[in-house]
């Protein structure tokens, strides 16, 4: 092969490798990125962004998270603050269909608050019990709750763990 042909072949192989690496990286991107982007798009003009972490199945902590969300909506107004509650581990109990706090969750959702449900936790429950309990249909599934918190904080959200 002549010198120009080798050069063209090298360039072609380099481009194929670069495109393959880009495609592989895109395929490996976490699905929570899509959820995070949807969260950021929900209230693009919000002056404040808050993520509330709930990882405990404690009625007092659940009530506190709900109270914080209500109080911030009242203080800033629903158009001025974006609030996302990320539940994982035992904290997903707040989003069960039979939760005693369901009416409060639904009310907050109606005011623009997002409630994220960690699918890693749901998968663990399914593996251990053989079934998935019913969850509030307003819950937004995310692949990993902690990864969702990280993505949100990297995009301007302030993390609060009441």
Name these PLM-found stretches.
Residues 10-20:
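Bacterial N-terminal signal peptides
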Residues 4-5, 21-24:
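N-terminal twin-arginine translocation
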Residues 25-162:
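Secreted/extracellular ectodomain signature
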Residues 1-12:
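Bacterial N-terminal signal peptides that target proteins for export
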């Amino acid at each position: 092969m002549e010198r120009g042909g080798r050069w063209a072949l090298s360039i072609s192989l380099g481009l194929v490798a670069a495109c393959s690496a880009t495609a592989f990286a895109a395929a490996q991107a976490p699905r929570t990125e899509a959820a995070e982007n949807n969260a950021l798009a929900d209230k693009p003009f919000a002056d404040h962004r808050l993520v509330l972490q709930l990882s405990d199945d404690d009625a007092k902590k659940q009530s506190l998270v709900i109270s914080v969300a209500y109080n911030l909506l009242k203080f800033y107004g629903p158009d001025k603050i974006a609030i996302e509650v990320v539940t994982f581990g035992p904290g997903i109990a707040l989003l069960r269909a039979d939760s005693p706090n369901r009416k409060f969750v639904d009310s907050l959702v109606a005011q623009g608050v997002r409630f994220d449900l960690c699918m890693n936790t749901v998968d663990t429950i399914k593996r251990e019990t053989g079934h998935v309990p019913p969850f509030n249909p307003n819950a937004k599934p995310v692949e990993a709750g902690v990864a969702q918190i990280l993505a949100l904080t990297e995009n301007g959200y302030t993390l609060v763990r009441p």
